[in-house]
Every structure is written in structure tokens, then in C-alpha cells.
Amino acid sequence: NEKVAAEYKRRYPNDTVIVSDAHEYLLHNFKRFDFIWGSPPCPTHSRTNYFTQAIKKVPTYPDMKLWQEIIYLNQFCKGLWAIENVIPYYEPFLPQYTKIGRHFIWSNFKIPVIEMPKNEIGTMMKQYVGTGKHAHDKTLEDRNAVNSELGLHILNCAVGKILIKKDYEQESLFGAGM
């Protein structure tokens, strides 16, 4: 989404922003990264979708990109990865996840549970648009954003593992012969 990419680039000008099909990009580029964060589209997994289908009577399959990414990274990625999504309306068939707030996070490293604000969605919205008459102007992309404290927590867990791994690799390289 060009609009989301432009806003991200505005907020984080030192980051490299790639506008592409993230699912396809991941498949061909995952080996290039020490840490991968994925957040595939969630509307078809959401508990809200379950009720929407019951009301509108329009059946919709869950988007399997979520499971494709988890399975693929779990089998082939040597780096660290975390895939975030909403709590689904069904029982996940891959139960190795961490539940934090309104999120399930599948990963290949430990992510300790932290307390999230009870009204996490409202808290996030107030952070970006405040309260009052303009709060309803919140875009879907902003509403779907992961709480920044949760994102930082997951990143810190990954960075800690990367630093430990790199320190260990460094010691094993020079430790035996010196």
C-alpha cells in the first residue's frame, strides 16, 4: 500500500521501505534478514468475521497466508521470526503461540507475556488521533496497527536473541584456538 509506505517513511526516514506483495517478497528474500516480523491480513481470521458471516450469510474461507508463512518460516528460516495476528474465531491448528492482549504471536524464540492496557484498541486510537469529533477519521491501517509497546517488546526479545547468538558465534570462532 503506497499510502501506508509513505506514512511509514515519513515517521521513520532512516528505514528502507519496500512496497511489494509482502507474502511473495518474504518467500524470495527471507534469508537476507536476521529477524522477520510478519503480520498477514487478519480480517478472515478475526472473531468479528465469524459474526459478520452469520449476519450477512456470506461464507468466507480464512486467508491461508497466515499459516503458509508460519509453516514456511518454521521449516526453512535460520534467522528469528515472529508472525502476529488477531485471536482467531477457530482453534489454531499450530498451538505454539504466545497470547498477548488481542494478539497471537507465533515465533521461533521465547516472547514473555506482558500486560497490555485493558482497552488496547481505544488506547492505540487515542495515541494517534486523540479523542473528540475527529477520532472516527482513523484509517483502517492505523486501527490495525500493533500497539507500539507490544511491537517494541517483541523486537527487544528478538534483538536480545540476535546479540546472544552473535556473541556466541564470535566466541566460538576465536575461543578454541586462542
Which residue ranges define each predicted feature?
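Conserved active-site and SAM-binding loop architecture
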Residues: 1-178
